[in-house]
């Protein structure tokens, strides 16, 4: 069972539809016990970083997500949800994040239209489980004005938009997509299928303990 975190700032409906499409069992929840009982977690998000962190704090989900991230349970952040995984953001004000990944969220300062919205090429950097069946140079769908300034060793996908935008990051059990896999057609569905596979592998490993 995959828990989709519902904190009032997520693209919940489209993520639900995507998981339904790939046959994944899921629950939409903000209940701590349900999140801990799940086999994997998706943290979606649309909106401002400081507001999102305030809401997560109010719902006592900051601690929950940090515990999930520091365990071996698979965690996938999408768009703002990915940004929240980092140490802090410069959006509106300096604001601390979940600190599960090293790096800072900074405003895109490019001679192009902001937000970066639409389809862009994703170049793979290294291999991870979520790349199974995903061709290098596939196009994915973005909507964002900020990006992760983070170490190269956690970047597994890059798009160009005046700067190199980390489109996909990963460290251990933690994954983050700056783009929207649930809106990225067959390629996005394949990535979500791969995440489902990672979740199932983790669940099997727990049953054997």
UniProtKB/Swiss-Prot annotation:
GO cellular component: cytoplasm
Active-site residues per Swiss-Prot or TrEMBL entry: 79, 180, 182
Classification via InterPro entries: Class_I_gatase-like, GATASE, Imidazole-glycPsynth_HisH
Key words, A-Z: Amino-acid biosynthesis, Cytoplasm, Glutamine amidotransferase, Histidine biosynthesis, Hydrolase, Lyase
Gene Ontology process terms (BP): L-histidine biosynthetic process
Pfam families: GATase
A molecular-function term among this protein's GO annotations: imidazoleglycerol-phosphate synthase activity
Chief location bin: cytoplasm
Keyword Cytoplasm: yes
Reaction equations catalysed: 5-[(5-phospho-1-deoxy-D-ribulos-1-ylimino)methylamino]-1-(5-phospho-beta-D-ribosyl)imidazole-4-carboxamide + L-glutamine = D-erythro-1-(imidazol-4-yl)glycerol 3-phosphate + 5-amino-1-(5-phospho-beta-D-ribosyl)imidazole-4-carboxamide + L-glutamate + H(+); L-glutamine + H2O = L-glutamate + NH4(+)
This protein's record includes keyword Amino-acid biosynthesis: yes
Purpose of the protein: IGPS catalyzes the conversion of PRFAR and glutamine to IGP, AICAR and glutamate. The HisH subunit catalyzes the hydrolysis of glutamine to glutamate and ammonia as part of the synthesis of IGP and AICAR. The resulting ammonia molecule is channeled to the active site of HisF.
PANTHER family: IMIDAZOLE GLYCEROL PHOSPHATE SYNTHASE SUBUNIT HISH (PTHR42701:SF1)
Name under which the protein is recorded: Imidazole glycerol phosphate synthase subunit HisH
Native source species: Bacillus cereus (strain AH187)
Gene field: hisH
């Amino acid at each position: 069972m995959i828990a989709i975190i519902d904190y009032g700032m997520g693209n919940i409906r489209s993520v639900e539809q995507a998981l339904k499409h790939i046959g994944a069992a899921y629950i939409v929840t903000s209940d701590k016990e349900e999140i801990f009982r799940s086999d994997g977690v998706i943290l979606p998000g649309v909106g401002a970083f400081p507001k999102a962190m305030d809401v997560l704090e109010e719902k006592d989900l900051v601690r929950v997500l940090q515990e999930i991230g520091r365990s071996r349970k698979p965690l996938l952040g999408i768009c703002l949800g990915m940004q929240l995984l980092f140490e802090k953001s410069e959006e509106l004000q300096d604001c601390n994040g979940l600190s599960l990944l090293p790096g800072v969220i900074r405003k895109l300062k490019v001679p192009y239209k902001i937000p970066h919205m639409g389809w862009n090429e994703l170049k793979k950097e290294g291999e991870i489980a979520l790349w199974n069946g995903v061709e290098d140079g596939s196009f994915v769908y973005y909507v964002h004005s900020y990006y992760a300034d983070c170490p190269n060793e956690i970047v597994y996908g890059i798009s160009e938009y005046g700067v190199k935008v980390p489109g996909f990051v990963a460290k251990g059990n933690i994954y983050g997509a700056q783009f929207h896999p649930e809106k990225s057609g067959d390629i996005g569905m394949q990535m979500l299928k791969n995440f489902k596979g990672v979740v199932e592998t983790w669940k099997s490993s727990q049953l054997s303990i």
